[in-house]
From Swiss-Prot:
Organism: Rickettsia conorii (strain ATCC VR-613 / Malish 7)
Ligand binding (Zn(2+)): H14, H27, H29
Lineage: Bacteria, Pseudomonadati, Pseudomonadota, Alphaproteobacteria, Rickettsiales
Superkingdom, taxonomy of origin: Bacteria
Any one Gene Ontology molecular-function term assigned to this protein's record: metal ion binding
InterPro entries in UniProt: 6-PTP_synth/QueD, 6-PTP_synth/QueD_sf
Keywords annotated in UniProt: Lyase, Metal-binding, Queuosine biosynthesis, Zinc
Name of the molecule in the record: 6-carboxy-5,6,7,8-tetrahydropterin synthase
Gene Ontology BP annotations: queuosine biosynthetic process
Biological function: Catalyzes the conversion of 7,8-dihydroneopterin triphosphate (H2NTP) to 6-carboxy-5,6,7,8-tetrahydropterin (CPH4) and acetaldehyde.
Pfam family for this entry, one: PTPS
Assigned protein family: Belongs to the PTPS family. QueD subfamily.
Catalytic activity: 7,8-dihydroneopterin 3'-triphosphate + H2O = 6-carboxy-5,6,7,8-tetrahydropterin + triphosphate + acetaldehyde + 2 H(+)
């Protein structure tokens, strides 16, 4: 198996419902996402994937949905709608609390399989950095 990794950076805000500390409040991060893609063999050009294709598919989705958005739990829709109405802020709703763990799992299991559906490779893992020192891997 041969693996290639592409980094994508984006800025987004979120909050964790029922968190007992400061993460219960709206705040933001400079997220760094590392997408690891693998194949059993390279293509006729000697590549697993053209890094530009990862950018075209994954970064485009991130830019349209997550970058400079507010990522909220679907139970936060009332607050999200008020923020969107007042500021025009882009809101992305998740079924779970938008923790780094849940965001990475959502991308790996629900979003990226749809983006890369007709390709000869697969996403093996994602690393999502919430800060330079803290990340999750799924």
């Amino acid at each position: 198996m041969i693996k290639c990794t592409r980094r994508i950076e984006f800025d987004a805000g979120h909050r964790i419902i029922e968190h007992q500390n400061k993460c219960q409040f709206l705040h933001g991060h400079r997220y760094v996402l590392e997408i690891a893609i693998a194949a059993n063999k390279t293509d006729k050009l000697g590549m697993v994937i053209d890094f530009g294709l990862i950018k075209d598919l994954a970064k485009k989705w991130i830019d349209e949905n997550f970058d400079h958005s507010l990522i909220l739990h679907q139970d936060d829709k009332e607050m999200g709608q008020q923020i969107e109405n007042c500021t025009g802020q882009k809101i992305y709703y998740m079924q779970n609390n938008p923790t780094a763990e849940n965001i990475a799992t959502h991308l790996k299991n629900e979003i990226f399989p749809k983006l890369f559906v007709s390709q000869n490779f697969f996403v093996t893992s994602l690393k999502l950095y919430e800060t330079p020192n803290c990340f999750v891997e799924v």
